[in-house]
């Protein structure tokens, strides 16, 4: 079975061999540290996210939106052409553009707090300003990621379930949220843990249900989610939700997603 066939059937793919060297990873981690400490090589602050720019919950997940704005090594990683090429091949499209990225810092859970969790969800619920669901996420492990430190969990095949849950049903209580999912007849709720060595990358479809639990290790879990959009997808105002990208890069009905917020990562315009 080819990677494309596996992705089409399961809604995810894991590049198990690291794509990046130890030196690359050291640069990415340092860049992440700089951004979390409000040091931006480009001079531009990323968009506000969860528990950031003011970190009020030291045990809570830190999620920094559009971290690539800050420049430096994280920007280079977010626009990495090798990742873009794999994403293009998995979606079976002509090319992909940046949608947005998210730096993810999951601290060790020193109590039974849920604030380090990312509840079960489908990205597509929040991205319906797009006229097609041809979007994909590359999740880059910046250190080793395993079950103990809260590896992302995926429900294989759930990208074929349509809108299986409402955005309003998402909570940090994993079991409670799972009980709300509309599972089609004949399908099963099966969890796959995306355990990755540092430098390895997983990919998942915009409709694939995913989430992550607490970090029970003694070190933070570090990752970068690069959300990419197929180069043929256009803006529509028919979606239920708007999107924060539109605040910095407004669109007219039917516009392609291009420009400073949506550079081409892989495709004819980069070759």
Outline where the language-model segments fall:
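A short secondary-structure junction signal
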Residues: 110, 116, 120, 130-131, ...
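Short, conserved beta-strand element in jelly-roll/cupin
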Residues: 121, 128-147, 195-196, 203, ...
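Double-stranded beta-helix
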Residues: 145-209
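Non-heme Fe(II)/2-oxoglutarate
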Residues: 42, 46-50, 55, 201-203, ...
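Short edge-strand/loop segments of extracellular domains
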Residues: 106-108, 155-162, 221, 227-233
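Short, surface-exposed loop/helix-turn segments at secondary-structure junctions
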Residues: 47, 116-122, 171-188, 220, ...
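Short helix-to-loop capping/linker segments positioned immediately adjacent to catalytic or ligand/cofactor-binding
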Residues: 86, 124-129, 140-143, 187-193, ...
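Non-heme Fe(II)-dependent double-stranded beta-helix
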Residues: 1-10, 16-120, 128-129, 167, ...
């Amino acid at each position: 079975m080819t990677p494309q066939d596996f992705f089409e059937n399961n809604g995810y793919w894991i590049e198990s061999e690291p794509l990046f060297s130890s030196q690359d990873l050291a640069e990415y981690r340092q860049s992440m540290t700089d951004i979390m400490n409000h040091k931006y090589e480009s001079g531009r602050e990323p968009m506000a996210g969860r528990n950031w720019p003011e970190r009020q919950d030291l045990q809570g997940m830190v999620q920094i939106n559009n971290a690539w704005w800050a420049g430096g090594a994280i920007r280079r990683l977010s626009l990495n052409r090798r990742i873009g090429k794999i994403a293009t091949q998995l979606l079976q499209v002509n090319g992909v553009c940046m949608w947005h990225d998210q730096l993810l810092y999951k601290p060790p859970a020193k109590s039974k707090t849920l604030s380090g969790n990312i509840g079960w969800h489908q990205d597509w619920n929040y991205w319906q300003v797009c006229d097609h669901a041809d979007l994909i996420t590359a999740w880059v492990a910046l250190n080793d990621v395993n079950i103990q430190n809260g590896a992302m969990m995926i429900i294989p095949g759930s990208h074929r379930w349509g809108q299986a849950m409402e955005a309003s049903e998402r909570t940090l209580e994993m079991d409670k949220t799972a009980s709300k999912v509309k599972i089609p007849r004949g399908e099963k709720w099966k969890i796959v843990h995306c355990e990755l060595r540092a430098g390895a990358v997983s990919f998942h479809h915009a409709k694939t249900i995913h989430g992550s639990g607490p970090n029970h290790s003694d070190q933070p879990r570090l990752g970068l989610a690069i959300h990419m959009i197929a180069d043929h997808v256009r803006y529509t105002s028919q979606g239920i939700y708007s999107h924060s990208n539109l605040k910095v890069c407004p669109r007219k009905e039917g516009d392609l997603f291009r420009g400073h917020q949506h550079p081409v990562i892989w495709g004819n315009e980069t070759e």
